[in-house]
Design a protein with these regions (language model features):
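Hydrophobic-face positions in mid-chain alpha helices that act as interaction patches
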Residues: 39-44, 60, 73, 80-84, ...
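Short coil/linker segments at helix-helix boundaries
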Residues: 125-133, 156-191, 195
Length: 261
């Protein structure tokens, strides 16, 4: 019996020692504490940020659903659970859907900030025109995605832009460096938030992005983002200029509404 027990304990010990070495090496992710070293690292970071942006925590559900439930376009019940407080206007800053949107938005913002730093780091190392163009494409998309994320966050967590509300609370601005653990942060003004959004968009324009897919940030839908931002700022001249650039672009096929009726 003693021999059986000793053998059994030996097997358990072997399994435990084996389990200690079962960590799977990352193949598509980069440790956030380490700089990006390859074009693929930068591309993966962009795809990760885009996935988070389109996921249910942010634009894929929560952002759109918040407007639907608060506006009584959709109805919630105790059995569904989600968005019940939104539907009844009994939510506060601790409501789950709002917390998730805030956290997810800043995950995207941090990912874009890291991506910009990584793309510039890798750009200094590569020599081929193809790799440089890929990184240039990524840089415009990171800046554009960061701007869009701040814009949509401001729609949820800030008052509507106006001269009266401009000095009021905006968002925490993460600029060239990510916020360190335990670093004290403050919300900027609404005016500074919108100024930073436009600054990001203008910076994005400085990169000659060759991306044409409508599923990614490209020069045309970046103009559409600018048009929407300026519309919310009540800058109607700027809105018309940006919107006209989209409408008159030959990048996408125009559809006649009469053909769809």
């Amino acid at each position: 019996m003693k021999k059986i027990f000793v053998s059994f304990m030996g097997v358990i010990a072997a399994l435990l020692f084996t389990a200690c070495n079962m960590d799977v090496p990352l193949t598509h992710n980069t440790d956030g504490d380490k700089p990006m070293e390859t074009v693929q690292d930068v591309t993966n970071a962009l795809h990760g940020a885009m996935e988070q942006f389109g996921g249910y925590r942010f634009m894929g559900r929560n952002y759109v659903a918040t407007g639907d439930f608060c506006g009584d376009i959709a109805n919630a019940s105790a059995s569904t659970g989600h968005f019940l407080h939104m539907n009844g206007w009994t939510f506060d800053e601790n409501s789950g859907e709002l917390e998730v949107m805030w956290q997810s938005g800043y995950v995207i913002i941090v990912a874009c900030t890291r991506g910009i730093e990584g793309a510039n780091h890798v750009m200094a190392k590569v020599s081929s025109d193809e790799e440089k163009q890929t990184l240039t494409n990524c840089l415009q998309q990171f800046y554009g995605l960061k701007a869009a994320t701040y814009f949509y966050l401001s729609n949820i967590f800030c008052k509507a832009y106006s001269a009266e509300h401009a000095p009021g609370l905006g968002l925490v601005l993460v600029k060239d460096e990510i916020i360190k653990p335990e670093q004290k942060v403050e919300r900027s003004t609404l005016e500074d938030t919108y100024k930073y959004i436009l600054e990001l968009i203008n910076k994005a324009y400085t990169y000659d992005n060759k991306e044409t897919s409508p599923f990614f940030i490209n020069p045309i839908n970046l103009k559409a983002i600018e048009a929407k931002v300026r519309l919310y700022m009540r800058d109607y001249t700027g809105t018309l200029a940006a919107a006209d650039a989209v409408v008159t672009s030959e990048a996408y096929k125009k559809v006649d509404p009469k053909e769809q009726s």
